[in-house]
């Protein structure tokens, strides 16, 4: 049997503070195939971001491990790019230079100067930021900053793109536009994506599978919902789609039941 592209295997995570140990995650198992879009959803404090940070290599698991493309994750690496809710752009660099920093760090030896420039411009064009190469972060909107963050992550040629509530700080219209752009990028490039979200509609719209976490402490995966809506997905058409609303109700029901039990 073929190994999954990304495997989260029997992860536990505990933190000790002032002599007291708290178990945040217990026995988290998840297999992700190449090109899948996975969303993780759950109530605040259920360890969603902890799972993502362990996959990113920013946190070590207390037990278990993460296997990506046949290799164990042991710390951060360029094969896993992360996009945060906060765009994390360097304010003293232009849009182009913010992406250039990452590209030069990874590809200065393997790409020529012209090739690197073309690659940077290509990734900024993917997120419709080709017109703003020379602008500074303070000169562009929040949605544009997040576009640059996504372009920078894609320019690193990651095996997995990790998204930690990437649209959470944006207004509804900007969020919808960016969601549509991410769907198009994933369709065109076939990226493997793993996203943390609190937004049920976002999870159903974007995902191939939705991973629903139980409440903490000792949170784990409660249910996994396969979202079999055909792609490409049109948010307007889906608003009245019975299947879309079935998936939406299933996630809301899980979250409501977990909240009631908590």
Cite the ranges covered by each PLM segment.
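A short, flexible loop at the N-terminus of ABC-type nucleotide-binding domains that lies
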Residues: 1-5, 14-27
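The feature captures the beta-strand-to-loop junction immediately N-terminal to the Walker
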Residues: 41-43
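Helix-to-loop junction immediately C-terminal to a conserved catalytic motif
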Residues: 56
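Conserved ABC transporter NBD signature motif
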Residues: 64-76, 112
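Short coil-to-helix segment of the ABC ATPase nucleotide-binding domain corresponding to the Q-loop/switch region
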Residues: 93-102
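Conserved ABC ATPase "signature" region
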Residues: 104, 111-132, 184
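Conserved signature/switch motifs of ABC ATPase nucleotide-binding domains
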Residues: 135-138, 156
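Hydrophobic anchor residue at the start of the ABC signature
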Residues: 150
């Amino acid at each position: 049997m073929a190994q999954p592209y990304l495997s989260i295997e029997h992860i536990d995570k505990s933190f000790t503070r002032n002599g007291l140990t708290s178990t945040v995650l217990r026995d988290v198992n998840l297999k992700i195939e190449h090109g899948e879009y996975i969303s993780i959803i759950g109530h605040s404090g259920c360890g969603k971001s902890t799972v993502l940070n362990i996959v990113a290599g920013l946190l070590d698991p207390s037990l278990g491990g993460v296997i990506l493309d046949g290799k164990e994750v042991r710390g951060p690496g360029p094969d896993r790019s992360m996009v945060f809710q906060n765009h994390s752009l360097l304010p003293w660099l232009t849009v182009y230079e913010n992406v250039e920093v990452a590209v030069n760090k990874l590809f200065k030896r393997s790409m020529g100067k012209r090739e690197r420039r073309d690659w940077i411009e290509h990734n900024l064009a993917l997120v419709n930021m080709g017109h703003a190469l020379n602008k500074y972060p303070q000169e562009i909107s929040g949605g544009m900053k997040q576009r640059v963050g996504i372009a920078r992550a894609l320019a690193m040629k990651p095996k997995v793109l990790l998204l930690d509530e990437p649209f959470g700080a944006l207004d509804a219209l900007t969020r919808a536009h960016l969601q549509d752009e991410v769907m198009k990028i994933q369709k065109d490039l076939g990226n493997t994506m793993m996203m943390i979200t609190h937004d049920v509609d976002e999870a159903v719209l974007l995902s191939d599978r939705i991973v629903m976490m139980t409440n903490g402490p000792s949170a784990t995966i409660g249910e996994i919902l396969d979202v079999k809506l055909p792609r490409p997905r049109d948010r307007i058409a889906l608003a009245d789609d019975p299947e879309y609303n079935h998936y939406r109700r299933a996630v809301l029901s899980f979250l409501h039941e977990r909240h009631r039990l908590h």
